[in-house]
């Protein structure tokens, strides 16, 4: 066990990786938020000023969960004949209703699409020392961070199980910071960037 030592005395910050709002949440999804809410309540009870953030992934999560495939938002939008923005709004509202039904205190809900400019800025900041570009996008080189994976006790030689092999990647565990829109395609959710038109990868979304 370790003694909890906040960065700022009297304050505690809890970040929960939020849902990809392309479909309804199931009980396994919600379990994580019950745990985080319980932690937050204990911290509040102990007198800490709590900030709890659950991000909303409304772009950039691919169907394989392994850094490859179609964007889940775009795929669901096409199947329902709606825009990706409409899909995101509908399922975010349903997720928030689920939180209320479970008596989970309402956290802050920043949406990924509201912070794309900040994501691009952060990508530019780390690109020179930590990233490399392929035809498919900008990738983070995990070998540039000697202690990468320490917090999760990950073994980088084996890689992370849900990260896909991509031609040209330097390391199996390297992941996409920015995914370029394939030539000849147009997506509903895409932005201009120094690495071409496309969308952020979900690792970049969570870190920003």
Predicted regions and their residues:
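NTP-dependent nucleotidyl-transfer catalytic core
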Residues: 1-208
């Amino acid at each position: 066990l370790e003694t909890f030592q906040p960065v700022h005395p009297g304050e505690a910050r809890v970040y929960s990786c939020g849902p990809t709002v392309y479909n309804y949440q199931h009980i396994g999804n919600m379990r994580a938020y019950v745990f985080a809410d319980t932690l937050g309540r204990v911290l509040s009870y102990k007198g800490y000023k709590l900030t709890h953030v659950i991000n909303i992934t409304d772009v950039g999560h691919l169907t394989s969960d392994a850094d490859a495939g179609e964007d889940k938002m775009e795929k669901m939008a096409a199947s329902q004949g709606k825009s990706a923005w409409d899909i995101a709004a509908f399922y975010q509202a349903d997720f928030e209703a689920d939180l209320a039904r479970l008596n989970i205190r309402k956290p802050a809900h920043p949406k990924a699409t509201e912070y794309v400019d900040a994501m691009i800025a952060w990508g530019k900041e780390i690109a020179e020392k930590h990233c490399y570009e392929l035809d498919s996008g900008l990738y983070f080189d995990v070998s540039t961070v000697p202690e990468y994976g320490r917090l999760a006790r990950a073994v980088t030689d084996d890689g992370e199980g849900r990260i896909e092999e991509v031609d040209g990647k330097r390391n199996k565990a390297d992941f996409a910071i920015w995914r370029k829109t394939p030539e000849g395609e147009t997506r509903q959710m895409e932005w201009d960037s120094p690495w071409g038109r496309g969308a952020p990868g979900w690792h970049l979304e969570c870190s920003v």
